[in-house]
Structure formats: C-alpha cells, structure tokens
Amino acid sequence: MDLFRWIKNACGGNRRPVAHIPDTPHTQPVRRRYRFSGRVQGVGFRYEAKGIAAQLSLVGWVRNQSDGSVVVEIEGAANYIEAFLLGIYAVPRFDITDVQTEDLPPLKNETAFRILY
C-alpha cells in the first residue's frame, strides 16, 4: 500500500486522526523526505508542519517548491514520523492529493525543525 493510501486509511478517510502520540519512540532514528502535492501552499502547511514536528521532538525542515508542492525532510523515531504524517493529513485546510517519499541516511546533528525559504 502506498503512503498516501496508508495515511487516508489510518485517518478513516475523515481527516480525524485515530492514532495518538506514541508513548515511546523507536530507538533508531530514521530520516525521510516527503513531497506533498495538492493544495499545500498558502494554507499554513509549513507552520503546521513545524508545530507538529516540535510536539513530537522531530528535527528537519520544510520548504515550498516552485511547482506548488511542499517538501519536508524529517528525522526521528519512525513511529513519531508516522504520527507527524497523521497530524498533517488531519488539517482540513490542506488538500493533499499525492505524497512521494524517499528514505535518507540520518544526519544526527540537527537540533530543531526549521522552515526554509
């Protein structure tokens, strides 16, 4: 199942997340890059992403792209990253039509989640 379908199924298709913040993170950090397409610019996506990432102690960055998509590069426990994705999908202002994902090697030297311009 692709990531976009997984997110929709996990939220029950109604944009209300059914998952909660995990009690304990997995011990091994992972880093992923996500490209979100749809109505994701001009709707506060970057600020919501930063807030959700901060709540989950995730690090990385988010940036608008010239093609109208938004790229998020995020690092932390895999189950916390899943909770981040559920939180993003639950925001009703966003109309996410596609998510592309790429696994990256962890950097392990970032200390915060930033908005890049």
Residue ranges and their predicted role:
Residues 1-117:
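Intrinsically disordered, low-complexity, mixed-charge
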